[in-house]
Every structure is written in C-alpha cells, then in structure tokens.
Amino acid sequence: MEHYISLLVKSIFIENMALSFFLGMCTFLAVSKKVKTSFGLGVAVVVVLTIAVPVNNLVYNLVLRENALVEGVDLSFLNFITFIGVIAALVQILEMVLDRFFPPLYNALGIFLPLITVNCAIFGGVSFMVQRDYNFAESIVYGFGSGVGWMLAIVALAGIREKMKYSDVPPGLRGLGITFITVGLMALGFMSFSGVQL
C-alpha cells in the first residue's frame, strides 16, 4: 500500500505532467483564464488519464508486448497508433457524456475537449507507463495521480490569472507574456519537490 501512496504523491507533485515535463501546454495556457472552466477541463483530463493509462496497459501487455499473443511476435511497433486510437475513443465517449449530461461544461470547454485527444499529457502518461513497466494497479494509480497533478496545476494557474486581472501588469507583458512568466515560477516551485525521496 505504501508503494501506491508513494507513486500517487510522486505523480502529483514530483513528476507533475504540466510543471515538470511541460506536457499539455496548449490547453494548459488557453483554458486557464477562469477557475471554473479550468476545473472542468482538469476533471476531464483526470477521467481520461485514469481510464486511458490502465486500458492501454492491458492493450500493451496482452496484445502489443513481445511474445504476448504468439511466441516470437513483437507488435510493439504499433504502440503509438494503438495508444492514440484508444485515447481518441475514450475522449469521444467523454465528449458524448458531457454533451448529454453537462451541456454548460461541454459548451465552456468548446474546441478544447476534442483537443484532449491530442493532448500530449495524456499520451505522455501512457508512454511513461510503458517505459516504466507499471503493472495494472500501478497504472491506475499513476494515471489518476498524473491527472490530478495536471488539474492542480491548471486550476492554480487559473486562480493566479484571475487575480492578475486586478494587478498593474506592464502593457508589454499582458496576456500570454505574464502567463509564461507565472508558469515558469510555478514550475520552479514544483522543482523543490524533486529532492523528495519516496
């Protein structure tokens, strides 16, 4: 149990997808203007990562890994296309569910919901799972922790950006300029976790 708690804390803080690996920056910067929208997208990313990482773990271990289907056959060259296909299918299902049951959130996310399909944080989580050879249980914890870490980062950035509306930011830095500086400072803050040994 201690191993799984350690993996969860590590994936949220120490190896944060957004602030340590800088994955998912497109939607991270574009949707982080309001906390409510950021929280909604963060929940969507948590759901997709929590499902996509373990599902792709099963696909990799039961189909794509060397000697998984037939002795001497290695289908790992199909990793990228298969993982992207699974992620795309999951995002389409999530999009239909949000459209049906949560229309305001679906409308607020707009074009960024389909962009979760190509969000490199999702694909990065799946790739790290394969690279680190996580088992099924570890992949569930890692997917959930990575999603929560990404959501924590985008909601924190949105909160800061909402407060910066009332600040006297120099004209040349308004908009994305000050946002990049803020993200850099947040990343420096998260770097302090890198010395933690779990």
Swiss-Prot record:
Catalytically driven reaction(s): a ubiquinone + n Na(+)(in) + NADH + H(+) = a ubiquinol + n Na(+)(out) + NAD(+)
Disulphide-bonded residues: none
Keyword Chaperone attributed: no
Keyword match Translocase: yes
Regulation of its function: This reaction is tightly coupled to the Na(+) pumping activity and specifically requires Na(+) for activity. Inhibited by korormicin and 2-N-heptyl-4-hydroxyquinoline N-oxide (HQNO).
Segments traversing the membrane: 11-31, 39-59, 77-97, 110-130, 140-160, 176-196
Alphabetical list of InterPro entries matching this protein: NqrDE/RnfAE, NqrDE/RnfAE_oxidrdctase, NqrE
Primary subcellular site in the record, as a coarse category: membrane
GO BP: respiratory electron transport chain; sodium ion transport
Membrane topology listed for this record: Multi-pass membrane protein
EC number assigned by the record: 7.2.1.1
Subcellular location: Cell inner membrane
Changes after translation: The N-terminus is blocked.
Pfam families (UniProt xref): Rnf-Nqr
Keywords for this protein: Cell inner membrane, Cell membrane, Ion transport, Membrane, NAD, Sodium, Sodium transport, Translocase, Transmembrane, Transmembrane helix, Transport, Ubiquinone
Entry GO terms, CC: Gram-negative-bacterium-type cell wall; plasma membrane
Recorded family membership: Belongs to the NqrDE/RnfAE family.
Role this protein plays: NQR complex catalyzes the reduction of ubiquinone-1 to ubiquinol by two successive reactions, coupled with the transport of Na(+) ions from the cytoplasm to the periplasm. NqrA to NqrE are probably involved in the second step, the conversion of ubisemiquinone to ubiquinol.
Complex formation: Composed of six subunits; NqrA, NqrB, NqrC, NqrD, NqrE and NqrF.
Name of the protein: Na(+)-translocating NADH-quinone reductase subunit E
Classification of source organism: Bacteria, Pseudomonadati, Pseudomonadota, Gammaproteobacteria, Vibrionales
